[in-house]
Amino acid sequence: MAAKGAHGTHLKVESEVERCRAEGQWDRMFELARHLQMLGISGGGSSNRRNSPSGRFTTLDTDDFVKLLLAEALLEQCLKDNHDKIKNSIPLLEKTDHRLNEAKDHLSSLLNNGKLPPQYMCEAMLILGKLHYVEGSYRDAVSMYARAGIDDISVENKPLYQMRLLSEAFVIKGLSLERLPNSVASHIRLTEREEEVVACFERASWVAQVFLQELEKTSNNSTSRHLKGSLSPDYELSYFLEAALQSAYVKNLKKGNIVKGMRELREILRTVETKATQNFKVVAAKHLAGVLLHSLSEDCYWSPLSHPLPEFMNKEENSFVTQTLRKPHLYEGDNLYCPKDNIEEALLLLLISESMATRDVVLSRAPEQAEDRKVSLQNASAIYDLLSITLGRRGQYVMLSECLERAMKCAFGEFHLWYQVALSMVACGKSAYAVSLLRECMKLQPSDPTVPLMAAKVCIGSLHWLEEAEHFATVVIGLGEEAGESLPKGYLALGLTYSLQATDATLKSKQDELHRKALQTLERARELAPDDPQIIFYVALQLALVRQISSAMERLQEALTMCRDDANALHLLALLFSAQKYYQHALDVINMAITEHPENFNLMFTKVKLEQVLKGPEEALVTCRQMLRLWQTLYNFSQLGGLEKDGSFEGLTVKKQNGIHLTLPDAHDADSGSRRASSIAASRLEEAMSELTLTTSVLKQGPMQLWTTLEQIWLQAAELFMEQRQLKEAGFCIQEAAGLFPTSHSVLYMRGRLAEVKGSFEEAKQLYKEALTVNPDGVRIMHSLGLMLSQLGHKSLAQKVLRDAVERQSTFHEAWQGLGEVLQDQGQNEAAVDCFLTALELEASSPVLPFSIIAREL
């Protein structure tokens, strides 16, 4: 019974030794080594145990086996304590760490005595090879592994810890070969060495994955047999196991072997994961996503289940064939998802990585976890950066903002994440939220001028929050020289804010003051950045707004020398020509600009006005047809792409709807149905368009600018039809616009114009009043209402409305003309003459469309 009990104890201790060596529990190894010495037995291998369980204890020298265990434990403890030095390839010195010296003495003694069986002698060589590497003796490490014959070692039916030793041996051999001096080696020998390095790394990766899968399987089985026992702690990867997992793909990618690097990464990600490899797989997925985004175009992509292009394979040399008997288990099945392009695969990888990274991120602010928190935040931030690139390339800014919002739980005090979220909100059109986020970014980095500058840009553009824009621009200017290149942009933002405030001001004195401040501020920006074409352009635009046409032309020519094809600059040039009454020159410039920017509707609206003045409404209606055709083309394109670009026509977010086609009405006589000779150009509109029209039941989806543009096209066509006295067709166009925005002030105003042309003055007056209620600052509405009131005999009220119009926009010459006519009817001839003279003066410098139609934005 005593012998049977001793035998059971021997088995238990031996199994515990193997388990601790596999799991890396090196502190426990010292206790087990002492236990073995007390028992006076050897720790025979599991293969011996299987073959001869009763005779293994007398064939081994206990002291030598204990030395082997102690040497490995001492070395592993030393490596764990010097992880950073090992990672940075800093050799460890025996004199600075006694454990290294003791381990080396034990191993040298074992190999010199040669009393251990071959299995343990081989293990001693593998451990000593690792020790040589950390000492910086790379040639000795390679020699020791050659002596151990690692290329011929099999992992079948071996203890788990031997698989770990073999995996580490392969990666260390590869690392040692990389670090050997190559000054005297031939080119052929260097190439062979490189191939051998890659082969070592590949084998190390395969063996490491098999080891970790088997280790977890063994641990799970052990836990299921001892349900009442405590769960074993998660396995912590050593430096060399981490290197074994990733060195193969890192080496291939560094050499430019994209195919092999991607193959390694994809195989790693397809292997059945373990707890120990979860974090590593996040890193691998991030690496593969980076390769897909930065090193592979969509034309060269191949899916995980297909083969790469032949030209890729021809460029990369053949590597050694890895003769691994066992392969790691892969995820397999009939319904596995397979990406179709590199963006799709990268997005899938990053979304998986993001879910894991945000789940495991360290949120604690405790000082002892500061380093872990820093590393986890860096990993999460890198993933979100790649997500920004991936989703940005597809224009999926809403999805990006949703992803980045999930990062806010770990973004406390992290400027980069806050700024990324803010930028994503800007891109997806959530401008007010973006400004709030940018305010927080300013608190985190108050000396960074780009943050308030971005906030000013958003406030000036989509929000029209001019007071806030003024504040943010002032913050940039307040940084002074610290703002660097952003300082001129700060003055530009402030100048544009003053200019927009002048446009919004209701008193002429306030308008003049703000225009003066805008011009002074913009000139200051030009002094700081004399070669910035954007600043010079806005100086020219500001001069045009205050009707300094000659000065504006000089500045604009200066800007055009730097940016000949800029759409806004060419647009302003055309408007300046039209203000000087050079309509043909203006039309030539607009046509040239449209050639360069065929999807710019602002240019086409100006072209319509120029053609209306120069050639009559017939030619202008042809351009309206082109605008409708362009709108429909962009709309159809948006159904296919579904890209998100707020406020842009380059990929509109509009869900597919069948049956949307646009056409202007047939220009027939309402009574006889015969075609008028004057309507030949207008009749050509329907020949290019479908018979179906945009019905009122269509749901408006996508950026509002898309639909307001369509509304303006219909209303512009209605105005042209009214000029030709084709009132039925004009009514049809207004009806189409009303189907989009029934209460729009533009629609109400045009309905009033149509009623006025028809002679329904009371109806026209009521519609003008409704339009003015919706848009109290509409000077054209005021002008038409004033004239209508005058025609109905309400002279005093007409005078008041027209005075409000000229006070609201002092450069509107038509309102001055109308006011003069009303004053003349009231017998105030002297005041009327002043109004007529002002109207003549302003008309001499009035463009076909107001200069303010050109966007003022950063």
Curated annotation (Swiss-Prot):
Q: Where in the cell is it found?
A: Cytoplasm; Cell membrane
Residue numbers carrying Phosphoserine: S52, S183, S648, S678, S679, S690
Q: Which InterPro entries match?
A: Endocytosis_PI4K-reg_protein, TPR-like_helical_dom_sf, TPR_rpt, TTC7_N
- What are its GO cellular component terms? cytoplasm; plasma membrane
GO BP, sorted A to Z: hemopoiesis; intracellular iron ion homeostasis; protein localization to plasma membrane
Purpose of the protein: Component of a complex required to localize phosphatidylinositol 4-kinase (PI4K) to the plasma membrane. The complex acts as a regulator of phosphatidylinositol 4-phosphate (PtdIns(4)P) synthesis. In the complex, plays a central role in bridging PI4KA to EFR3B and HYCC1, via direct interactions.
Q: What is this protein called?
A: Tetratricopeptide repeat protein 7A
Q: Which organism is it from?
A: Mus musculus (Mouse)
Query: What broad taxonomic lineage does this protein's source fall under?
Result: Eukaryota, Metazoa, Chordata, Craniata, Vertebrata
Query: What is the primary gene name for this protein?
Result: Ttc7a
